[in-house]
Amino acid sequence: MPPTTRRRILAVAGLTAVTGALGACGLGRDPFASEDSEDSGAGPIVVGSQQYYSNEIIAEIYAQVLETAGYTVTREYQIGQREIYLPQIESGDISVIPEYGGNLLQYYAKDPEATDAGSVREELFTVLPRDLTILGSAEATDQDSYTVTRATADAYGLTSIADLAELGGTVTIAANSELATRPYGPSGLMSVYGVDAMIDPVEDTGGPLTVNALTDGTVNVANIPPSSPAITDNDLVVLEDPKNLILPENVTPLVRKSLPVGATQAIDAVAA
C-alpha cells in the first residue's frame, strides 16, 4: 500500500481509538467454529477492503495486528462492492475482509428471517459458503440510512422512513448505484413501507457528493452512514426504521476457514 494511503488511514482513524471501539462489547464467535487449522507460513494473509474509507481503516487495523502477531500480510484495498470481492474471498484470493452483518446476510439469504444482531449472526452461519466463516461481531455498526434535510423533515413532518410517502410521487435517493438492487433499496421501500423510490446514482458511498446532492435539492433523500460527521455538520435527519428494513450492520470479520488459528485470534482481539 502506498505510504500516503497508510498515513491517511492512520490520521483519519485515530487507530487506537477505533480499535478500542471495535473491541467493545463484542457479540461473540461461533461456538461451533473449528479450531483445527494449523498456523503455517504458507503464503501471506491477504486482507481486503471495500471501496469505502471506513472499511479500509478497519482492514488496516486487521493488517497491522496480523503483522504484529508475526504474519506476512498483503493488502488489497478499495476492491469494490460485494459482487466483486465476495467471489474473491470464496475463491481464496482474499483471506479476510471487514464485513457488515446485515448486508452480508442479505447477500447470501434472499429472504432472511433475522431482525436483530444476534439472529443475524446465527443465520449467517447457516448460509455462508462452506469455506467461509465469521469471527466475533463488534457492537460498532456502520449502517445504511435514509436521511433528509432538516427543512424537508420539518416541512413534511418526517421522522420515519414510512413518512417519505408524504413527499408524493417518486422519491429520489442519492446513493451508490448498487442500492437499486439491494433488498432495502427501492423494492424494499415499496414492499415494507409503501414508498415509491428511485436511485439517483452518486458513487461515493455517502460521501461529499452524496451529501451535496441532498443539501442542494437535487434529490429528496440520501443514503449516508449515521456515523458520518456530515449528519451533524449539515443538521441532517436520519429517518427511523421501525420495521427493520435495514438489518443491523455490526462490523464483522469475514474470513476463510483455512486462516491460521493464531491469525483469527489476533483479529478477534480487536474485532470483538
Go through each PLM region and give its residues.
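N-terminal export leaders
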Residues: 6-10
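C-terminal motif of bacterial Sec signal peptides marking the signal peptidase cleavage site
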Residues: 21-24
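Bacterial signal peptide processing site
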Residues: 26-29
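Bilobed "Venus flytrap"/periplasmic-binding protein-like clamshell domains
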Residues: 42-74, 79, 139-209
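Hydrophobic residues within well-ordered alpha-helices
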Residues: 89-90, 211-215
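Paired acidic/hydrophobic, glycine-rich loop segments that form the ligand-binding mouth/hinge
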Residues: 95-99, 219-225
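Ligand-binding "clamshell"
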Residues: 108-135, 218, 230-243
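A bilobed periplasmic-binding-protein/Venus flytrap-type ligand-binding module shared by bacterial periplasmic
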Residues: 144-154, 249-262
